[in-house]
């Protein structure tokens, strides 16, 4: 019973978060020309709704039009109609006492059977949910071990940056003491751009954000909208990081930086990408965003920020 109640609560939060995620996806499309840091930030309410069972709904919220109690009423509508019809027939004398007694007994039996089927179904679904969580946890552990086995022979390049001939893309690995790992075939200019990109991840604590998001995703693995949201969130994370690199190093690096991303994509093989690391992904969209990047005006940022808050 405890497992079913737990899954029921998770399901409720997942459904509510789905509405928020759809709204975020729409807003994300509307502000697609805005800095990606805004697109990245608006995923916070989705993460919040996935873990918080308490609703904070304004009078203008669309959720006010969705009365969850009405769904519970609908569930018993058919049964209520049957009971009312039977009682009406008894009162009008259309059925004998024996038939009336049998009818009431049948209704009680049907109600018990329906409840039993519902409880069994919820129990089975809860078991499947828990199995899915365990599978994803095992996948995470195996991925972590496999990645660690590849980088344990890496050599120090400088500070917390390591080079390895066992990887073909750059990424941050580790949670408590994150380190930057880069492939050995990068040029010196590529190293500057790629290392700066990974340093931004570390400075913003993106490695913490991503692992929290993935752990939440494991709990809500049954919801396809959450998988889509996770992919889009990590995409916004990467592109906002690219924009920060250009802000730090100057917009004149657009072309060379794009070539660096493209080079990593061409050489990328089967390196495991796990939540504790950041490997290069969705290169096409990232390159397009880099080449089209323009430092936004302050008034534009203010308008977008006010629109998101509203």
Predicted regions mapped to residue ranges:
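Membrane-embedded and juxtamembrane structural elements of multi-pass membrane proteins
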Residues: 2-78, 111-310
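Low-complexity, acidic polar-rich segments
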Residues: 82-116
């Amino acid at each position: 019973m405890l497992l079913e109640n737990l899954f029921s609560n998770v399901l409720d939060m997942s459904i509510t978060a789905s509405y928020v995620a759809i709204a975020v996806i729409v807003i994300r499309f509307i502000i697609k020309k805005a800095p990606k840091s805004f697109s990245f930030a608006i995923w916070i309410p989705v993460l919040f709704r996935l873990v918080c069972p308490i609703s904070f709904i304004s009078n203008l919220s669309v959720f006010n039009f969705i009365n969850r109690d009405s769904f519970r009423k609908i569930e018993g509508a058919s049964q209520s109609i049957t009971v009312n019809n039977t009682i009406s027939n008894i009162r009008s004398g259309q059925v004998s006492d024996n038939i009336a007694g049998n009818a009431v007994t049948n209704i009680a039996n049907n109600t018990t059977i329906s409840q039993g089927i519902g409880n069994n179904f919820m129990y089975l679904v809860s078991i499947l949910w828990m199995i899915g969580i365990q599978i994803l946890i095992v996948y995470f552990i195996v991925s972590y071990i496999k990645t660690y086995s590849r980088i344990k022979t890496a050599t120090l390049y400088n500070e917390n940056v390591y080079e390895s001939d066992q990887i073909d893309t750059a990424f941050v690995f580790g949670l408590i003491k994150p380190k930057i790992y880069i492939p050995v075939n990068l040029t010196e200019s590529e190293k500057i751009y790629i290392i700066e990109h990974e340093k931004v991840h570390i400075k913003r604590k993106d490695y913490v954000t991503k692992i929290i998001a993935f752990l939440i995703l494991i709990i809500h693995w049954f919801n396809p909208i959450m998988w889509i949201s996770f992919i889009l969130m990590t995409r916004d994370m990467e592109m906002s990081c690219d924009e920060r690199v250009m802000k730090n190093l100057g917009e004149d690096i657009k072309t060379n930086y794009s070539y660096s991303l493209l080079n990593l994509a061409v050489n990328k093989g089967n390196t495991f990408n796990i939540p504790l690391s950041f490997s290069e992904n969705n290169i096409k969209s990232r390159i397009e965003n880099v080449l089209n990047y323009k430092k936004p005006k302050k008034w534009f940022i203010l308008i977008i920020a006010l629109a998101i808050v509203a």
